[in-house]
Amino acid sequence: MTQRPDCYYCSKHQTGEDPPPGGWLVADEDWLVGHGPAHMSLPGTLRIESRRHFTDFADMTDAEAASVGVLLARLYRAVRPVTGAERIHLLATMDFQPHFHAWLYPRAADEPRRGTAFLDQGFECTDAAAEAAAAAIRSQLAPATREGRG
């Protein structure tokens, strides 16, 4: 697996430092998924991180591209009932950390801002709220595994 010693994500995956609130929700061959850091997340915000070092969708292997689609579907199904989100926004820029990672931001129906205005507002929640959301999302993900849906 390709890793770069100067990369924040590669380093944290190797050392186990800076774990997500509530721990990893998904840890498979290609992906790690955890709740986003509380200081930049709404409760239920998830961050998907590639285990292999690459920058964007164009750099994915065919297997990674296929698996991320299945993973996203599972995550959307788990986040929506926990957060009550009307929409879940997917954001992946890699501008600050050039290692593939994507954010899932749940947007409530009563949130007046839409699209990029919603994403531009900045988010923050407590560590306790992030950990509680992670636990609830973990319980939503568990039945999908038992039923063979992912």
Residue ranges and their predicted role:
Residues 1-150:
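HIT superfamily nucleotide-processing domains
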